[in-house]
Structure formats: C-alpha cells, structure tokens
C-alpha cells in the first residue's frame, strides 16, 4: 500500500506518523503557540527529526465550538506556511482544510495531501480534488465543529460511520478521484461521545478490511482525557496507547501532536512484529 504525490512515494506497509501543525490562535491542544512562521518552521523541523514523515498544516481550529474562519484568513494563514515548509524540507505536506480555494492555492506551493474533515462536501471541494489528483483523506463528522458535540446519537456508531465512508467513497470515485488516492478517517471526537469513540477504536479493523488506508487521529482528544481525567498537556502516554491500539488493528497513518513518544512506541511495536 503506497501513496504517490509530486514525485514522492509514501510506503504504508509500515505505519507513518503525521505531525500536527495548527497555525491558528485557538487550537484546543497548543493554544496558538506556533502561530508565527519562525516558530512553525522550528516545530516542523523538530517533528521531522523525531520521526514524522507527514506534516499536517491547518489554519482553522476544528475543536468543538470553534468559530469558522473566512477563506481569506485561512489562505493568509496556510499558504505561506506550506510554501516555507516546502522550500525547506522534503517531507510530505498535508493541508487540513475543507475549502476548495485553500486546497488549490496550497497545491500551487507544494501540498501533497488533502486532509478534509468534511469529506469534500463543501462547495467545489470534490471537483477541485479531482483536478488536483492528489491523495485525499475523507473523514466522518456528525454535524459541524460548532455543534457536533451536542448529544451525538447513532443507531450503531460503527455501522453508521462505515456506511457514510463507503457512500462518500463511491461518490468520490464516481466524480473521478482515483481509488489509490483515498484515505479513510473515522473522525474520533467529531460528533461522537466517549463511548462512541472507543467503540470505533475497538472495531477499527473493520474499516481497514475494506481496503483503504486508515488514518487515526485521537491524539490528546477528550476520549483520552475522559479516561485519564487529565488536562490536554498530560495526555501523551494515553495518546500513545490509543495510537498503539489503532496500529495493532491496522491503521496506517497516525495523526499526532507528540511525535517522539509515538515514534518510540512504533519502534517497540515493529520490533515485536518482526520478532
């Protein structure tokens, strides 16, 4: 299983680490501490040295109750960072956006992967993704970030999320997205209760069996905090445990804040798998 973009290849026969760079003043985890270009580049270098192969750049906070960001503001935040990272590093660059214009402009300066929490459902997003012909991660979310955690309900969360991803995948394929360019994300924490999240994690292998690489993003989220009863900055070990379970069940990309801890975990897991 491999991804290709811009003359680069990402080998998914081993799990890959996607390091999170929130270029926003209001992210739930890092509270804007990398909200300057110099700090952002320093953080990117650190994450790459620690073992990340993908850097995921986001200009809109998608935490619960987050305010939406205008197209112009998101462009202003994201495009210069993508360009600066591309000029300096040879890593994979993912952009966490649902806006067609952001996808297009980011691709012009070196983006390799579209990471869309709204699964290409915003205006012109699907058509833009088809034209760009880059790998794209589609995610399940019930509602929108502002309201998604208001009593989420499912008949069966595993089957409901699976049905959405299969339906959306078929729509993407019909529109012209190549099968080998699709990645699935179950959307931990996006319109799900703590119980829903753990049911999805427990059954993550069902999603992997369909044949698309699965991205797991549960780093520092409330599903970890609820079990540990610890604030965001004290969820590193819990997040690594969740990531390990995801990998054991077949996840191929781990979207994380704490790259070093995740990389150490993967090395021990790999040594065991190879024994």
From Swiss-Prot:
Keywords tagged on the record? Folate biosynthesis, Magnesium, Metal-binding, Transferase
Disulfide connectivity for this sequence is none
Task: Write out the GO cellular component annotations.
Answer: cytosol
User: Which positions does UniProt annotate for (7,8-dihydropterin-6-yl)methyl diphosphate binding?
Assistant: 62, 96, 115, 185, 221, 255-257
Pathway listed: Cofactor biosynthesis; tetrahydrofolate biosynthesis; 7,8-dihydrofolate from 2-amino-4-hydroxy-6-hydroxymethyl-7,8-dihydropteridine diphosphate and 4-aminobenzoate: step 1/2
Give me the segments passing through the membrane.
Answer: none
Q: What class of enzyme is it?
A: transferase
- At the top level, the lineage of the source is Bacteria
One GO BP annotation is: folic acid biosynthetic process
Function summary: Catalyzes the condensation of para-aminobenzoate (pABA) with 6-hydroxymethyl-7,8-dihydropterin diphosphate (DHPt-PP) to form 7,8-dihydropteroate (H2Pte), the immediate precursor of folate derivatives.
Under which name does UniProt file this protein? Dihydropteroate synthase
